[in-house]
Amino acid sequence: VGILLPIESYEGAIPKMKDQVQLIQRVESLGYDAVWVRDIPLYNPDFREVGQIYDPWIYLSHIATLTISIKIGIASVVLPLRHPLHVAKSAASLDVLFPNRFMMGVASGDRPVEYPAFNKPFEMRSVSVADHMAMLRELWSKDFPTYNNDYGTLMANVGDVLPKPLKKNIPMYVTGHVGGINLDWIAKNGDGWIYYPREFTFTKKI
């Protein structure tokens, strides 16, 4: 069982983030398995909430340092808005620094306002997620990987991504339906599926 941060009841869109570490430590002492944060680059008033405010990678490092063994997860990294090299290095760093604790959800994002801000096409987000996941696995599993695509060019034997994850891979849990990617694709390409809370009758149909 996991907890989505922040642990707080608040009015409006922006939490105060008061005493979060103490609350997370309490959650760990009660036997919860994990705490999760979200990847929300921009505050959009139309969505009326901003998650835990802080950058997910930095905040998870902060949490992991001040806890003992509770798992730390992102639900989920908005892959189309991030470069695979940055995601690969950040995720692998958490995996190595806090062994067997980091979990990574991946998503296409659901806030159209973010895409023009990053100069990314919203309508291509499902393709971007698929390409991004494949590239992450290459960057994690191979020494001196190469690529020549929309993300840029990395020639043979000129650069490597370090550190590598402990098992040369990090499971990726696909969130939602990723902008049109269906369940068959998720079953084939993802390591798990994270979905939004829904009524039981809806979940049963899935």
Where are these regions (language model features)?
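Active-site-adjacent structural elements that line small-molecule/cofactor binding pockets in enzymes
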Residues: 1-206
